[in-house]
């Protein structure tokens, strides 16, 4: 009787622990609101060139701040439907409406993921990748996890440049 009870308790605990290891949209949305240091690598296939940039991304109650530290110092502030771009080297600022940017990845970053949104499909692959496929723009964004931590984001932009963004929590 005691052995059976121990076996049942073990099975319940194991199933709870196994569920903790599964990635989900709620985990992705939580990970997308953390502050990170990042290294972004982009491959322009037409020029066969890889560019690198690095910086930090911060989330707060009203928006997102992205500080690019290399190769050029730029700050981006996304708030209230607008993107402010500040080129620190040239000391120039520009405002862009988020809707005019028409960027699938940016919209995911701002709004998060809702599995019932008809403008994209969600696919979980091998319990370590969440793919978001736009039904309107034929765009795919992949979020790669390691031990339930968002480690890498991959996407191809509208001009065919492939991007990989490695993340490290701050």
Question: What is each residue range found by the language model?
Answer:
Residues 4-13:
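Sec-dependent N-terminal signal peptides
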Residues 16-18:
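Boundary at the C-terminal end of the N-terminal hydrophobic targeting segment
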Residues 28-48:
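A short, Trp-centered hydrophobic/proline-enriched beta-strand micro-motif
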Residues 32, 58-63, 78-82, 125-127, ...:
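Short, solvent-exposed coil/turn segments at beta-strand boundaries
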Residues 40-42, 70-72, 80-82, 89, ...:
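A mature extracytoplasmic/lumenal domain signature
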Residues 56-104:
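An acidic-aromatic
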Residues 90-129:
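Flexible, surface-exposed loop/linker segments and immediately adjacent secondary-structure boundaries
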Residues 123-170:
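Gly/Pro-enriched, hydrophobic low-complexity segments
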């Amino acid at each position: 009787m005691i052995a059976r009870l121990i076996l049942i308790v073990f099975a319940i605990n194991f199933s709870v622990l196994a569920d903790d290891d599964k990635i989900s949209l709620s985990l992705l949305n939580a990970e997308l609101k953390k502050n990170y240091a990042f290294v972004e690598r982009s491959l322009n296939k037409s020029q066969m060139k890889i560019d690198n940039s690095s910086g930090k991304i911060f989330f707060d109650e009203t928006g997102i701040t992205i500080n690019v530290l290399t190769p050029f110092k730029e700050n981006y502030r996304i708030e209230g439907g607008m993107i402010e771009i500040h080129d620190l080297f040239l000391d120039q600022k520009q405002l862009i409406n988020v809707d005019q940017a028409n960027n699938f990845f940016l919209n995911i970053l701002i709004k998060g993921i809702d599995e019932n949104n008809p403008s994209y499909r969600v696919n979980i692959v091998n319990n370590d990748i969440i793919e978001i496929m736009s039904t309107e723009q034929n765009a795919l964004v992949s979020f790669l996890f390691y031990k339930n931590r968002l480690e890498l984001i991959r996407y191809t932009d509208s001009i065919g440049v492939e991007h990989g963004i490695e993340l490290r929590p701050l």
